[in-house]
Regions:
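Metal-dependent DNA phosphodiester-chemistry modules and their immediately adjacent helices/loops
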Residues: 87, 261-289, 295
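Subset of Sec-pathway N-terminal targeting signals
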Residues: 1-15, 23-61, 65-71
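DNA-recognition alpha helix
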Residues: 117-128
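Conserved beta-strand -> loop -> alpha-helix junction used to position metal-binding or nucleic-acid-contacting
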Residues: 228-235, 240-276
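Basic, short loop/linker segments at the boundary and entry of helix-turn-helix/winged-helix-like folds
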Residues: 59-112, 128-141, 208
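RNase H-like nuclease fold core
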Residues: 79-82, 90-95, 129-133, 142-231, ...
Length: 401
């Protein structure tokens, strides 16, 4: 009686007795191990029968390795030949995971923010399979070609609205020090009214110069026009946008402006100042807003001149939204939409204090995005009405029919 038959009978006995067949102490792992090694021996026999006729190639020992399967860990003894021409198919060279379902599960757990330690513990507990951090990393690296293809895909020629903002993380540099990295994100609304992440870009810091590179990349990938760009108050950002998309309307985030203003107002005045400021950004039109800004300055200008000056200096960019309908104003007066996306991403990345590499950061953020975008199947509420308003406003730049 050979070992394969013994393992088969053991599996059958455990099945009848109700014992576990899978994972730790299960009978299927050793049975699978026998089957795989027998198949490899058969492959080598077939390979040598062809080689020996021409070159006299012979066996040259075996190479042992551990392979993870959904039934547990198995030891594979891969035969070797003297000429090194044997290429096994049953278990390929350098293959350490023999179950696409297992690899997919690892990637899915990683995409949900599960730590490598918890992933390893789960597979050890459920399948008696030992996964090192390097193994998990190599499995999740399978998504890297997908990221490359996604980052270079062609885009639509026109987007109705785009929000541009950065999210920051800590990453180890080449010397092992934790440094800040910014991921620049461009979240857009296409002509169908659906959210779309046009791109994400890793850089050492947020700045207008790098945003210029980002916008140029969008142009190179087919974007010809963005009707409205919504941004924070980064200096030089509007100029960077209009150097690439000169017809775009640029709206500075009102919420950012308010936050920055309040920082320089004394705590005992903040409540009253905010109430007065609300009459400016909450006005019915731009003329009314300008009149209320004059009133704000007459009351608070001597006490907080720098705050008032900031509103004056950025006035045209801060008040772009007044030329649109209330429904469109609600979408563009703040970068809340992209910040909401960032909050969803952080729910996944919050378990990572410092990322070991830029690649590991980009990999996890992309996987988080891949799950988030599954919900972006429907257009914005009342998009039919909004798209008509945009078509009337922008004419030939936004044809919907």
């Amino acid at each position: 009686m050979d070992n394969l038959e013994i393992d088969y009978k053991k599996a059958a006995q455990q099945l009848r007795s109700g014992e576990a067949l899978f994972g730790k102490d299960g009978a299927l792992a050793p049975l699978l191990e026998r089957i795989l090694n027998s198949a490899l021996e058969g492959e080598m026999d077939a390979h040598l029968s062809e080689e020996e006729r021409s070159s006299g190639n012979r066996r040259n020992g075996k190479m042992s390795k551990k392979v993870q399967t959904k039934y547990g860990e198995v030891t594979i003894e891969t035969p070797r030949d003297r000429d090194g021409t044997f290429q096994p198919e049953t278990v390929k060279k350098r293959e350490t995971i023999l179950a696409n379902g297992m690899a997919d599960q690892i990637i899915e757990m990683y995409a949900m923010g599960t730590s490598t330690r918890d992933i390893s513990s789960y597979f050890e507990r459920e399948f008696n399979t030992t996964l090192s951090a390097d193994t998990i990393s190599s499995i999740t690296d399978r998504v890297l070609p997908e990221i490359t293809a996604w980052k270079s895909r062609m885009l639509d020629p026109v987007y109705a609205i785009c929000w541009l903002d950065a999210i920051h993380y800590k990453v180890k540099d080449e010397n092992g020090r934790a440094v800040t990295r910014a991921i620049y994100n461009i979240l857009g609304i296409n002509k169908e009214g659906q959210k779309e992440l046009l791109g994400m870009y890793v850089s050492k810091s947020e700045g207008a110069n790098f945003w210029l590179e980002v916008l140029t990349d969008l142009q190179n990938r087919g974007v010809r026009d963005i009707l409205i760009c919504c941004i924070d108050g980064l200096k030089g950002f509007p100029d960077a946008i209009q150097s690439v998309f000169p017809e775009s309307s640029v709206q500075l985030c009102i919420v950012h402006q308010i936050r920055n203003s309040i920082k320089y107002v004394g705590s005992k005045h903040q409540k009253e100042f905010i109430k007065d400021l609300r009459t400016v950004y909450g006005a019915v039109n731009k003329d009314s807003a300008a009149a209320n800004l004059d009133l704000l300055e007459s009351k608070w200008g001597e006490m907080y001149p720098i705050v008032i000056k900031s509103w004056r200096d950025n006035w045209e960019r801060l008040t772009e939204y007044f030329q649109y309908t209330p429904a469109i104003r609600k979408l563009i007066y703040t970068t809340y939409t992209v910040e909401g996306y960032h909050r969803q991403v952080r729910k996944v990345t919050k378990t990572k204090g410092v990322f070991p590499t830029d690649n590991s950061l980009e990999k996890l953020v992309y996987l988080a995005y891949r799950n988030i975008r599954k919900k972006w199947t429907m257009p914005l509420a009342n998009w039919g009405q909004l798209s008509q308003q945009l078509a009337i406003k922008f004419g030939d730049r936004f044809k919907i029919m």
